[in-house]
Design a protein with these regions (language model features):
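Long, histidine/aromatic-enriched segments associated with O2/redox biology
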Residues: 1-295
Length: 295
């Protein structure tokens, strides 16, 4: 997981969600999957490949290490009316990223082979980096991420070396988005489209994405580590494969509650009205490699 977190600018990602069918085979499969990762890392050392194996509450709470993650729960739906974050909880998340698509794909094939019939894959999404690290909305993405190894690891990892993970897919309606002026798009984000400069709080709209997601509690920022990437096809569904890591699930959930209007002011994120629709959502816990080998 450290390689996932510390590679801040990975060019490609694969996100696989599955349900567990044979729980008694998972520990051995995890060990073999870690061996697959080590082999690919040795073969392609220049590509900075990393992998996370993370588990939903239904499986994780049956293990001897459940106490490591007291906040873990199944993803509930958030929001109301037409602004909903649907719950599509699964048992296993496999997150692979690197600077080379072939390395990712090779590792994904190897890992799925070792899990075999023990899992039932429900979704596989392939992400890619765009120019200047912009999303399909043409705004720079991930600016609020912590930077530098120390800040990244302290934000993402708990005292056990594990991390809470949020996996969502947001489908973008680019035709709708392009009908808004640049000024309206910037109002939606809270930043300049060209320069990525953050708007001052005095002029920032309370429904801007920055206002809804850049949160503080008792003066302390509720930071998360994002490793999201655009995904999809030009002719079909496309959007953002959103994945976030945090030492506390609370940090992740607070952002969702503010984006989807589940807080006192009831305001929702402009992006959910003007650009994006959440089409999936799941919480997972990613244990350390040492814990994975002892499941």
């Amino acid at each position: 997981m450290d390689n996932i977190l510390l590679n801040e600018h990975a060019q490609f990602g694969i996100f696989i969600e599955a349900d567990i069918k044979q729980a008694n085979q998972i520990q051995a499969a995890c060990v073999k999957a870690l061996d697959c990762l080590a082999a690919i890392q040795a073969k392609f050392p220049q590509h900075q490949i990393g992998m996370t194996l993370a588990f939903g509450a239904n499986f994780w709470q049956s293990t001897q290490y459940a106490a490591q993650s007291p906040e873990l729960k199944n993803f509930p739906s958030y929001g109301k009316n037409h602004t909903i974050a649907p719950a599509t909880q699964h048992d296993l998340l496999i997150h692979i990223q690197s600077n080379n698509y072939d390395a990712n794909f090779t590792l994904a094939l190897d890992v799925l082979a070792v899990f075999g019939s023990a899992i039932d894959v429900k979704n596989e999404t392939h992400g890619f980096r765009r120019y200047e690290e912009r999303g399909l909305d043409d705004f720079v993405d991930g600016t609020e991420n912590p930077h530098g190894d120390e800040k990244i690891l302290s934000t993402a990892l708990d005292e056990h070396g594990g991390s809470y993970v949020l996996m969502q897919r947001f489908a973008h309606d680019l035709s709708k988005w392009q009908q808004y002026s640049v000024a309206e798009q910037e109002e939606s984000i809270g930043r300049s489209k060209e320069t990525n400069e953050e708007f001052d709080k005095a002029i920032r709209h309370p429904r801007s994405h920055l206002a809804r997601s850049n949160l503080k509690e008792n003066g302390v920022g509720l930071k998360i580590v994002r490793r999201s990437l655009p995904y999809g096809t030009a002719s079909g569904e496309h959007g953002l494969a959103f994945i976030a890591y945090a030492a506390r699930l609370h940090n992740i959930e607070a952002q969702l509650q503010h984006m989807f209007g589940d807080v006192e002011d009831g305001l929702t994120d402009f992006l959910l009205e003007r650009l994006s629709q959440a089409i999936s959502g799941a919480y997972y816990y990613a244990p350390s490699k040492e814990t994975l080998r002892r499941l």
